[in-house]
Amino acid sequence: MLQPKRTKFRKVHKGRNRGIAVGTEVSFGTFGLKAIGRGRLTARQIEAARRAMTRAVKRQGKIWIRVFPDKPITEKPLEVRMGKGKGNVEYWVALIQPGKVLYEMDGVSEEIARHAFALAAAKLPMKTTFVTKTVM
């Protein structure tokens, strides 16, 4: 699963997921899966969607993952009283703003790409849409 090799700090503040997305255009492939909603993707969700797409295209074409989980999420163990410091890092997430391209695909037909992205979207906790590269 995806996670940073090393970070400056082990734990980070919760923060807020505001602002506008960076990376809103399809830049590597021909087709893309774009987030409509705001939220956060765990490393497990990113990997599950990638596997669903890879199986759908039968290992042909190329897939790019445009998001990376770089924010650690901590949890305290069950039945532990409040206080006594911040919990341990349990998983990593990527914060997603509306308009962010999550995955890109190339080397397959549009019909196959739409089917693969539909399978991937079912694994994700936010609304997404299918986009194609705009040629100017």
Curated annotation (Swiss-Prot):
GO terms for molecular function: rRNA binding; structural constituent of ribosome; tRNA binding. GO terms for biological process: translation. GO terms for cellular component: cytosolic large ribosomal subunit. Keywords: Ribonucleoprotein, Ribosomal protein, RNA-binding, rRNA-binding, tRNA-binding. InterPro entries: Ribosomal_uL16, Ribosomal_uL16_bact-type, Ribosomal_uL16_CS, Ribosomal_uL16_dom, Ribosomal_uL16_sf. Pfam families: Ribosomal_L16 (PF00252). Binds 23S rRNA and is also seen to make contacts with the A and possibly P site tRNAs. Belongs to the universal ribosomal protein uL16 family. Part of the 50S ribosomal subunit. This is Large ribosomal subunit protein uL16. The gene is rplP.
